[in-house]
Swiss-Prot record:
The gene is caiE. Keywords: Repeat, Transferase. GO terms for biological process: carnitine metabolic process. Belongs to the transferase hexapeptide repeat family. Residues 180-198 have a biased composition (Basic and acidic residues). One of its GO terms (molecular function) is transferase activity. Transmembrane segments: none annotated. It comes from the Bacteria. Overproduction of CaiE stimulates the activity of CaiB and CaiD. This is Carnitine operon protein CaiE. Pathway: Amine and polyamine metabolism; carnitine metabolism.
């Protein structure tokens, strides 16, 4: 892991969190229990404070940053998909930000909301609970259904389990030169594949 103090502020990481060795945490970063931070994530706490609350995840290639005197927060069980950018915003409890989405300064994503992949949430947007946000700029399409929220929670549970699995089962290695016979497949703990296109 790459941890850097900045002007006396040192990242804080709960011992039950998992931070991938290629992720970078700088300065005023606070990571809660059971958090998963994926490969190549960048958390630059060199201006504002960055907070990942318990059970949340920040996947591969995500970026967190914010202006001075602001907090960029992912609340409890928040789920941030691959390549998303969070800048000076707040993601509510149990909300999901889809892959390659951008959430701008002062925006608030309501609890149990879902931001669709590739969406752009404008600065200052003030969301409410259980909104499905889609597009660039993002607009409220409808309320999140119980089925969608259940699917989101299953996916978040997978990442909470992955944090545990990675703490014990991830190790740097050299690659094999050929595929071994009867190569096993990895399995998750739940069936999280989407049932149909939205």
């Amino acid at each position: 892991m790459s941890y850097y103090a900045f002007e006396g502020l040192i990242p804080v990481v709960h011992p039950d969190a998992f931070v991938h060795p290629s992720a970078v945490l700088i300065g005023d970063v606070i990571v809660g229990a059971g958090v998963y931070i994926g490969p190549l994530a960048s958390l630059r706490g060199d201006y504002g404070r960055l907070i990942l609350e318990a059970g949340s995840n920040l996947q591969d290639g995500c970026i967190m940053h914010g202006y001075c005197d602001t907090d960029t927060i992912v609340h409890e069980n928040g789920h941030i998909g691959h390549g998303a950018i969070l800048h000076g915003c707040v993601v509510g409890r149990d909300a999901l930000v889809g892959m390659n989405s951008v959430i701008m300064d002062g925006a608030v994503i309501g609890e149990e909301s879902i931001v669709a992949a590739m969406s752009f949430v404008k600065a200052g947007f003030q969301g409410e609970a259980r909104q499905l946000l889609v597009g660039s700029p993002a607009r409220v399409l409808r309320q999140v259904t119980d089925q969608e929220l259940h699917w989101k929670r299953l996916n978040t549970k997978e990442y909470q389990d992955l944090a545990i699995r990675c703490r014990t089962g991830l190790s740097e290695t050299k690659p094999l030169t050929q595929v071994e016979e009867n190569r096993p497949r990895l399995k998750g703990t739940t069936d999280v594949k989407p049932k149909s296109a939205q």
